[in-house]
Amino acid sequence: MKLVLFLNMGGATNLQDCEVFLKNMFNDPYILGIKNRFLRKFVAWIITKARVKAMQENYKKMGGKSPLNELTQSLCNKLNLKQDEFKFDFVNLYVPPFATEILQKYTLNESDEIILFPLYPHHSCTTVTSSLEVLQNEISKQKIQAKVKTIDIFYKNELYNEMIVSHILAKKSKFDAKILIFSAHSLPQSIIDKGDLYEKHVNDHVEILKEKLKDHFDEFILAYQSKLGPVKWLEPNTSDVLANLNDKALIYPISFCIDCSETIFELGMEYKHLAKCDYDLISCPNDSDEFMEFILNSINSPLARKTSC
């Protein structure tokens, strides 16, 4: 068996899971860098209690759940129907399905292969490293003997970027804006200052896409969303950019592969009340045919795969 596991943070599928998501996220040492495990757990509990009601109210506006799990499951289902060499499934970091239950679904031996596919185009310790570490620890804990490989970050991949360009231009044909905003999930500046590659990768990715789209837009803006708390985060804020923009714009959520609360609610609903200009949101790759083509190409390419340590 060749088992491909998509890795993501996950999204709450009901209002009760909002608390589970927050508790697990803020108890992640890559998110909340408190070395003492008990102190980190206590601080995570405080933050969760302070934020859970607001998160639940936001989720109610999306129908009570994030679309992330359903879209990822749809992606897996379509890929499993499209071919029979690989079996596709997914693991979330902060809400079910977790690594333990997914790995227990399969009987794996030395002749089998697990391919870990983080659904993050850019590297960050808060996403890629954290997800891979959890999976590799669980594989070791369950004494699984299968060979483990990972798909490397893919923001430079030509197929992936041609897909993005195609999706952007398809939306532009219906909403003719001259400004394109690339909105990336923000990170605290302190994480970047410790050597995290995320900001560099996002900047490099924007330059690649600008070159491909330079004949279609007059202006490109990189902005960052989803800031939390009083510490310094990557800037400018997407909300501030929209509040000060006079001309209509398109937004592409450059750091997301699957639509989630950050795209559907934050970009699609919340910022509408802050924006001076009219804007439209481009969907993430989700379960599109082009994204599936990129995925199958990646897992079949030895250049895209590396053996995990």
From Swiss-Prot:
Localisation per UniProt entry: Cytoplasm
Binding positions for Fe cation per the UniProt entry: H185, E262
UniProt GO MF annotations: ferrochelatase activity; metal ion binding
Any single GO CC term annotated in Swiss-Prot or TrEMBL for this entry: cytoplasm
Keywords: Cytoplasm, Heme biosynthesis, Iron, Lyase, Metal-binding, Porphyrin biosynthesis
Family: Belongs to the ferrochelatase family.
Protein name (database record): Ferrochelatase
Organism name: Campylobacter jejuni subsp. jejuni serotype O:6 (strain 81116 / NCTC 11828)
Primary gene name: hemH
